[in-house]
A protein has these predicted regions:
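Short beta-strand segments at enzyme active-site cores
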Residues: 81
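Short, low-complexity, polybasic intrinsically disordered segments
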Residues: 64-71
Length: 180
């Protein structure tokens, strides 16, 4: 028997802090996980799982999400993600002043590699449909341990509502351009 404050899985303090910060929710199936701890430090880890109706809060440059379904596989060195979701959403407060983006369809394939503080992410394909727009995208993101990182993105918009463009102009554009 355990109380509400007890943990069923032994995690290091940093992992516990991340769980409390992002508050993940949803269903997980076919979960396979392994880890190696040295004292209180998580040295090696690996996880593979299918998920449905996944949600988590945003934090810093990390996006939030709700209603996501798919598969994830990762370790401390690399990972891959496949999304196939109907009604869902992402939250990008570090990028957009109007951070909540709702989708009727969201499909994606991505992978990443980690070497020290350097993180390289490749978005193989993204397909999205929502009230404001529909289209596809692919690209890459590189984080070197400093600043927000560098993104190279190519997108094709098949349908867009011009009245909603202001919602998708990032903070970097400035309020004057959004209000124009």
């Amino acid at each position: 028997c355990s109380s509400a404050g007890d943990s069923l899985i032994a995690v290091d303090p940093r992992s516990r802090e991340l769980l409390e910060q992002y508050r993940p929710e949803g269903r997980v199936s076919e979960l396979r996980a392994s880890w190696t701890k040295l004292e209180d430090v998580l040295e090696h880890y690996a996880l593979k799982a299918n998920f449905s109706d996944l949600g988590l809060l945003p934090g810093g440059y990390f996006p939030g999400a709700k209603g996501l379904s798919g598969m994830i596989e990762f370790s401390e060195k690399s990972g891959s993600l496949a999304l196939d979701a109907g009604r869902s959403g992402i939250s990008l407060p570090a990028v957009f002043p109007e951070p909540e983006i709702a989708f009727d369809l969201l499909r994606a394939r991505a992978n990443w590699k980690v070497a020290g503080e350097v993180v390289d992410v490749k978005l193989e394909r993204l397909q999205f449909e929502g009230a404001d727009a529909a289209g596809t995208a692919s690209g890459s993101y590189r984080y070197t341990g400093e600043g927000p990182g560098v993104i190279d993105l190519a997108a094709s918009i098949s349908r867009a509502d011009g009245r909603a463009v202001w919602r998708y102009l990032p903070h970097a554009v400035g309020a004057e351009a959004r209000d124009w």
